[in-house]
Amino acid sequence: MKVLKLLSCIAFIIVLTSCERKYRWSPSECALQHYPARILTNNFQYKNGGGVGTLERVAGGSGWGYTGASYAVGERLKPVPDSLFVNWFSITEGKFYKGKFKLTSKKIEEALKKGQIRVYTCFAPHGRVVVYVAGKHGRAPIDRFRAIEDTSMTIAKHILKINGVKTEQEFEEKYGEKLDGSTYLKHYIKKEDSIYISKHGIPDTW
């Protein structure tokens, strides 16, 4: 009897999963023009498991609300994303942020039905995260969140990780120079960005 009930439950779950509507959409990211962010993780996860995400890269050139790179990931038709997992380095602040958020799936699905084909995450200083949809009807914000600072990660640890070494001594032996976090930051912050930030500071509302 128990076996029959278990099989019935499994069959019911399979039916629900197979009936889940899917849409044509792709993930992307963005950041403010003068406040670049190095995206470490930007994953949209499905309710029944799995998901799609973007690659690790620096965002910020497109400006707020405008999508960055286009990613042809996953199947052509995908389920509506249910949650978002993010982890990034706010370059202008020198801080790392992380968070996992429940998305307003109903709003996203309504937008996808209308022909929106891009679901993307915009990253701002102070852990601000805004999820947008975009397509033939323009773009619109769906959700706003605030991530927490990841104090376990530092610029030095990040540099060691992306260079495939474990200690500062290994870094010096490999590259013949001392690990310098300020040099790393200057590599991503343009002169015009520095001028803009010195005039306007780092705002906390988006």
Predicted feature residues:
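Sec-dependent signal peptide recognition
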Residues: 2-9
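C-terminal motif of bacterial Sec signal peptides marking the signal peptidase cleavage site
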Residues: 15-18
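Bacterial signal peptide processing site
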Residues: 20-22
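Structural motif
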Residues: 28-39
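Tryptophan-paired
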Residues: 42-92
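Edge beta-strands of extracellular beta-sandwich domains
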Residues: 95-102
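Low-complexity, Pro/Ser/Thr- and charge-rich linker/hinge segments at domain boundaries
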Residues: 103-133
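Activation corresponds to long, low-complexity, non-globular regions
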Residues: 127-206
